[in-house]
């Protein structure tokens, strides 16, 4: 119920601003924890920011704008974030009954889709649903059955993102999450060979990026430190609605 919500906001603006306002709202009411490991800092966000960005773009682009009074809703709960927009699947099928890796791209609003493609907010090949899952599964604290879920009804499309740091008992202690992740890393260590296979990065490419001089190493360290502070900052311990 609306009266039970901690915060309720409505926006009327162009699509680019609506995307910004939506992301700001979600970031304000979700958390990104971290824990200091022996040799590094481990970030443990509730959600993948990029996956949620992809989801919000998907809902803004593919919603049915012929539905008068229709809106894109963002509902934030303790254990999940739900995005809802008017408009079911164009071919009349139910997305929950489909293999998302075999769903062809069908654009309800091609002009809007082209605009977002030009802004580099989406890809032309229509991989949004797959990308949301892949981005979530890459997080270190990902658990099975916590991948984004999609559902369609007669006139609506739903995307649900599950809080990776939450279970039936409430918020999972950050140390418990860190220990689980650390055990996984010990079982499946990341070495130079696996880094090359997955990311194309090795010691030579690192030297090429930052230089092999003390000044280059110091500069690279400084860049990494500033980037980390800018991206993660202090955790916001706010309530959600």
Residue ranges of predicted features:
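C-terminal regulatory or interaction extensions
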Residues: 1-241
């Amino acid at each position: 119920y609306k009266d039970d919500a901690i915060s309720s906001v409505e926006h009327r603006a162009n699509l680019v601003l609506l995307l910004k306002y939506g992301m700001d709202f979600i970031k304000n009411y979700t958390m990104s924890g971290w824990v200091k490991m022996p040799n590094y800092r481990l970030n443990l966000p509730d959600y993948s920011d990029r996956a949620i960005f992809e989801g919000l773009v998907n809902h803004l682009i593919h919603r049915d704008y012929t539905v008068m009074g229709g809106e894109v809703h963002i509902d934030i709960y303790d254990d999940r974030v739900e995005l809802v927009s008017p408009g079911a699947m164009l071919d009349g099928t139910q997305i929950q009954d489909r293999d998302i890796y075999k769903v062809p791209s069908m654009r309800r609003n091609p002009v809007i889709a082209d605009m977002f493609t030009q802004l580099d907010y989406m890809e032309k090949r229509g991989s949004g649903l797959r990308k949301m899952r892949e981005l979530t599964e890459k997080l270190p604290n990902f658990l099975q059955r916590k991948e984004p879920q999609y559902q369609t009804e007669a006139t609506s499309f739903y995307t649900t993102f599950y809080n990776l740091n939450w279970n039936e008992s409430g918020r999972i202690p950050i140390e418990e999450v860190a220990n689980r992740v650390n055990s996984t890393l010990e079982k499946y260590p990341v070495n130079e060979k696996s880094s090359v296979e997955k990311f194309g990065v090795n010691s030579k490419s690192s030297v090429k990026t930052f230089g092999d001089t003390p000044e280059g190493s110091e500069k690279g360290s400084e860049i990494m430190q500033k980037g980390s502070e800018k991206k993660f900052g202090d955790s916001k311990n706010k309530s959600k609605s």
